[in-house]
Curated annotation (Swiss-Prot):
Family the entry assigns: Belongs to the class-I aminoacyl-tRNA synthetase family. Glutamate--tRNA ligase type 1 subfamily.
Protein name: Glutamate--tRNA ligase
Keyword Ligase: yes
Documented EC number(s): 6.1.1.17
Gene name for this UniProt entry: gltX
Any GO molecular function: tRNA binding
One GO BP: glutamyl-tRNA aminoacylation
Pfam family, one: Anticodon_2
Keywords annotated in UniProt: Aminoacyl-tRNA synthetase, ATP-binding, Cytoplasm, Ligase, Nucleotide-binding, Protein biosynthesis
Functional description taken from the UniProt entry: Catalyzes the attachment of glutamate to tRNA(Glu) in a two-step reaction: glutamate is first activated by ATP to form Glu-AMP and then transferred to the acceptor end of tRNA(Glu).
Assembly: Monomer.
Reactions catalysed, as given in the entry: tRNA(Glu) + L-glutamate + ATP = L-glutamyl-tRNA(Glu) + AMP + diphosphate
Enzyme class: ligase
Amino acid sequence: KLVALYQKEMSYAGEIVPLSELFFRDEQILGDDEQEVINGEQVPELMNHLYGKLEVLEPFEAAEIKKTIKEVQKETGIKGKQLFMPIRVAVTGQMHGPELPNTIEVLGREKVLSRLKKYV
């Protein structure tokens, strides 16, 4: 699944190592842009809603994760970049990357919840 996430970005298999670093790091190192995103006033409410839903989500798969993010959008009224960017930064430490629901699935529930909890 990990290789499939980055298939379009890779020319050869060895490129997977730097691309997939976020999956193996315990601590996120945020740059100024990422820090600005994660400091948004909507972030605690957003992370709290998402954390609660992902904690009990079954099955923990991309399609269900995508639906869950949509539910959080409806419940909080937070949408667009205000919704997706803080989730991406909290979960990956990056502003860009592969499809967010797929990334969340591959990271796994435990790692995702641990990362979200820092911003609740």
